[in-house]
From Swiss-Prot:
Keywords noted in UniProt: Disulfide bond, Secreted, Signal, Toxin
Protein source organism: Micrurus corallinus
Keyword Signal: yes
Signal sequence residues: 1-21
One Gene Ontology cellular component: extracellular region
Protein name: Alpha-neurotoxin homolog 1
Length: 78
């Protein structure tokens, strides 16, 4: 019984992956707030001609006129 309980605890910890969630700023247009990102990656997207960057979770690809900065620490995209 103890072995079964220990196995369930280990499986739960591995499946939930506690160590890889971080807090990122999330902003579109004029509002700015934080969000928990399960991916463990934050981004800041700077588009030429737009004064405020877009921020969020993940790491989108950059393109012509768009610079994307990705990072992996709490609130690193601020």
């Amino acid at each position: 019984m103890k072995t079964l309980l220990l196995t369930l605890v280990v499986v739960t910890i591995v499946c939930l992956d506690f160590g890889y969630t971080i807090v990122c700023y999330k902003r579109h247009a004029s509002d700015s707030q934080t969000t928990t990102c399960l991916s463990g990656i934050c981004y800041k997207k700077i588009t030429r001609g737009i004064s405020r960057p877009e921020m969020g979770c993940g790491c989108p690809q950059s393109s012509r006129g768009v610079k994307v900065e990705c990072c992996m620490r709490d609130k690193c995209n601020g």
